[in-house]
Amino acid sequence: MWLTILGVALAAPAGLALYFVATARRIARPTRGEPIVRDATKAALLVIDMQEDFTRSQGANAYDGQERDRAIGRINALVAAARKAGEPVAFIRQEHQGRAVQWIASLLLGGAGNPGRPGARLDRDIDADGCPVFVKHVADAFSDPALDAWLREQTVGRLTLTGLDLAHCVRGTALGARNRGYRVTVDLAGSLAAREKPALHAVDEMETAGVVLRGPEDGAPRAAMV
């Protein structure tokens, strides 16, 4: 009896660690879908996960306040430019789905990203008036079929992505978009990254997939921005 209990106790941490790893991989995996049509040429802007749970976090993964304000200023400028050009703009929100994932978020992130929290809303300084908001439960925003359908209805074939986190949901959405044939640009000046090494790895991965990384001034790829 005691040996059985001891065995379970010893195995539990290893099993829990494996579950964490498997869950993280599932959440990070880019989705695949039907290729877009050839005549889809319109441009659109997607702003990812700029929610107060993340932008104004005070925990270990908190973003620098000045960097956050810089990114928000850039995003608002991109939104204004897209509106002036008559291009669609959409915002993406993260909501963790499932008790296990929400428990992990509570354990590791203080509950950030769990539904029903005041911090689940878009940042107070973001200009999202009149823009549709799509909710995702994993890194790739294309996991919500409504987003892809909305883009296809408007014959969008070119996407500019920005937001957070560059190493996770921006990366996942960029790769999910490329899997469907969208031409993708990531605006680094409007993007935030909590950790440098994962962000640099994501930059390499996105460039390999054909994503254009635009810096703040000359439009050239700028890994140094992260």
Predicted regions located by residue number:
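Short Gly/Thr/Asp-enriched flexible loops that form oxyanion-binding sites at enzyme active sites
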Residues: 170-180
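Internal catalytic-core helix/loop-beta-alpha segment
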Residues: 115-163
